[in-house]
């Protein structure tokens, strides 16, 4: 049992002892055991003259018999009691109520609240600050990683080989510094892991702890600043002193953006305390005193908010980007996590990796775990590929909401809405392939068309972005064509938002507007309160931007309308199939519209000869929505 458990048991035993002591004194247990008798029996003994003396305190009567035995009883409101006792020669002693309580017991009860408060305060001070150091607020909360338990090594980290190589070099330096010092090299003072959430930054730190044969301390950025002024700076000093005593060692600071934000962007005492903590960290990392052998490794997914002084060489010499894995990285990560579950030969890591572009390592781990849970729920002994597909749909599209009972009218409208998305997506050559279309409510949506790129995408061209806008607008267009303009629903609100975001990014960030040109008009850096500031633009330019955004969205709207009008029969076919089957894969949709068997696995290049025709129509639509010179002058005025 650890010290904390023994301390809790000791305080519990003390509390029980005090309660027992209270009961003992209250029952006069230390003064002898008294025989309780009834009041009628007491009166009989008085009349028989067998009672020598009594002590009366309120309604409690304690007495001594002629043979020396003691007794006690409780008296009702009996006016003739005293006369009856004196007539039978019984000695009477009357005691005030206030003096009945034992002196020690009274002292204990009067001081008990104060003693309890002192005891609780001492208890918490011991627990929070290392066993009795009541003023230990400034002590570092860095935890030394124990050698007990399973170790995570670089073998458990997959898909981020570049980051592993950089960190392996640091581990090698700590193990054998002479190898690098022969050439005059110095160990890096700090290493910053940068990347989106779930890419394995903390896992890398755990692997370093498992690989390095040196002490490894870990702490969170939020552990420095608390309620007392100066605590953060004191904890930073104590952390580095702890590191120097155990050098060579590694100190890992997770989520360093909690304490390392830009100085001067906030107001108030809390911000001053955070800046004081950051200043102390800057001095400790690269100040007058050297920290030989103490390597700082930090992780963050917000490098844009970190102070520039923290990022300079000499503090964080290396900044390692930990990005989402590519298809090969995803395959390696899946193989690592598949080792932990039972699966059959139908599960192919390469196929799963190809169908999960953009997934982080944490999302892939969650995918494998969800598949195992689905298989267990169905009573299977092994996970198969169908379970993996179900898990992927759950992660991508959300949990199926079986509690929602859609009417036939809503189901029909949703089928045409999602059918419009899917059909336009098939006829847009630059759009990402359709993964699945469903009218089963998932997450916050009544239906969904999920698109997945065939390869990892790191940028998009104009045609891809325009195709995405057309696919976004296709659901609303389908509702308008089938049910009329007055029957269009609010279900396309999120689609309109997505299309607007893409169009505005094309105009203000990517420079893909001929009218505005390659000029950046997006949001700039944070202001002093941490809010995003937009670039200063004139009112005329703002109107031009709005006009260009509207033009691009209208162009996508007309493009989608042209496709759906031309292929209205296919829209009806697809919508009816969604009503019947509720969920269709991209391959099933192609088979359906090509007249093949729904579950045919033959390669199907759909559409056949329509892509060129649609491209020509798109150019006509561009001419239709083109901003004329007169319109430009009107907007500018």
Curated annotation (Swiss-Prot):
It is a multi-pass membrane protein. Residues 28-103 are periplasmic. It comes from the Bacteria. Zn(2+) binds at residues 417, 421, 495. One of its GO terms (biological process) is protein catabolic process. It holds the Pfam family AAA_lid_3. Gene3D superfamilies: 1.10.8.60, 3.30.720.210, P-loop containing nucleotide triphosphate hydrolases (3.40.50.300), Peptidase M41 (1.20.58.760). The keyword Transmembrane applies. The chain crosses the membrane at residues 7-27, 104-124. Residues 617-637 are annotated as: Disordered. This is ATP-dependent zinc metalloprotease FtsH. It comes from Rickettsia typhi (strain ATCC VR-144 / Wilmington).
């Amino acid at each position: 049992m650890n010290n904390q458990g023994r301390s809790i048991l000791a305080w519990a035993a003390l509390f029980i002892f005090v309660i027992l002591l209270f009961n003992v004194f209250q029952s006069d247990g230390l003064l002898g055991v008294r025989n309780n008798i009834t009041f009628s029996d007491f009166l009989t003994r008085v009349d028989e003259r067998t009672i020598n003396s009594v002590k009366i305190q309120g309604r409690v009567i304690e007495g001594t018999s002629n043979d020396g035995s003691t007794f006690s009883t409780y008296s009702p409101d009996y006016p003739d009691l005293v006369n009856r006792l004196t007539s039978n020669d019984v000695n009477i002693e009357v005691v005030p109520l206030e003096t009945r309580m034992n002196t020690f017991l009274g002292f204990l009860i009067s001081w008990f609240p104060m003693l309890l408060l002192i005891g609780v305060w001492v208890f918490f001070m011991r627990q929070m600050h290392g066993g009795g150091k009541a003023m230990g607020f400034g002590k570092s909360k860095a935890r030394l990683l124990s050698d007990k338990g399973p170790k995570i090594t670089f073998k458990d980290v997959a898909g981020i080989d570049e980051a592993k190589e950089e960190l392996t070099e640091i581990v090698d330096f700590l193990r054998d510094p002479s190898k690098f010092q022969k050439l005059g090299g110095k160990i890096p003072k700090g290493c910053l892991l940068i990347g989106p959430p779930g890419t394995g930054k903390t896992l890398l730190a755990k692997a370093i702890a498992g690989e390095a044969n040196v002490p490894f301390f870990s702490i969170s950025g939020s552990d420095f600043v608390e309620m007392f002024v100066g605590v953060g700076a004191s904890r930073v000093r104590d952390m580095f002193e702890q590191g120097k005593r155990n050098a060579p060692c590694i100190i890992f600071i997770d989520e360093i953006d909690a304490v390392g934000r830009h100085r001067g962007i906030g107001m108030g005492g809390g911000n001053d305390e955070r800046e004081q903590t950051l200043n102390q960290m800057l001095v400790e990392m690269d100040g007058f005193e050297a920290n030989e052998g103490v390597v700082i490794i930090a992780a963050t997914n917000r490098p844009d908010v970190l102070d520039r002084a923290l990022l300079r060489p000499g503090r964080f010499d290396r900044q390692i980007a930990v990005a989402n894995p590519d298809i090969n990285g995803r395959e390696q990560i899946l193989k690592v996590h598949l080792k932990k579950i039972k699966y059959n030969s139908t599960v192919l890591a390469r196929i799963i990796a190809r169908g999960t572009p953009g997934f982080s390592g944490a999302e892939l781990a969650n995918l494998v775990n969800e598949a195992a849970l689905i298989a267990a729920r169905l009573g299977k002994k092994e996970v198969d590929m169908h379970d993996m597909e179900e898990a992927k749909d759950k992660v991508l599209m959300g949990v199926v909401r079986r509690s929602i009972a859609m009417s036939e009218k809503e189901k029909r409208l949703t089928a045409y809405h999602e059918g419009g998305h899917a059909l336009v997506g098939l006829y847009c050559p630059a759009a990402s392939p359709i993964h699945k279309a469903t009218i089963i409510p998932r997450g916050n949506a009544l239906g969904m068309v999920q698109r997945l790129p065939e390869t990892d995408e790191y940028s998009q061209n104009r045609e891809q972005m325009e195709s995405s806008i057309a696919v976004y607008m296709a659901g609303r267009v389908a509702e308008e064509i089938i049910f009329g303009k007055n029957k269009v629903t609010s279900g396309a609100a999120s689609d309109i938002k997505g299309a607007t975001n893409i169009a505005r990014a094309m105009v203000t960030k990517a420079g893909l507007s001929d009218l505005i040109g390659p000029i950046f008009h997006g949001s700039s850096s944070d202001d002093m309160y941490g809010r995003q500031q937009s670039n200063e633009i004139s009112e005329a330019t703002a109107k031009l931007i709005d006009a260009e955004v509207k033009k691009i969205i209208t162009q996508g709207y007309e493009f989608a309308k042209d496709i759906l009008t031309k292929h209205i029969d296919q829209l009806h076919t697809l919508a009816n199939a969604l009503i019947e089957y509720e969920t269709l894969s991209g391959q099933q949709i192609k088979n359906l519209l090509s007249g093949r068997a729904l579950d045919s696995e033959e390669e199907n290049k759909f559409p056949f000869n329509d892509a060129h025709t649609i491209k020509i129509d798109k150019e006509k639509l561009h001419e239709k929505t083109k901003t004329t010179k007169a319109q430009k002058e009107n907007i500018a005025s």
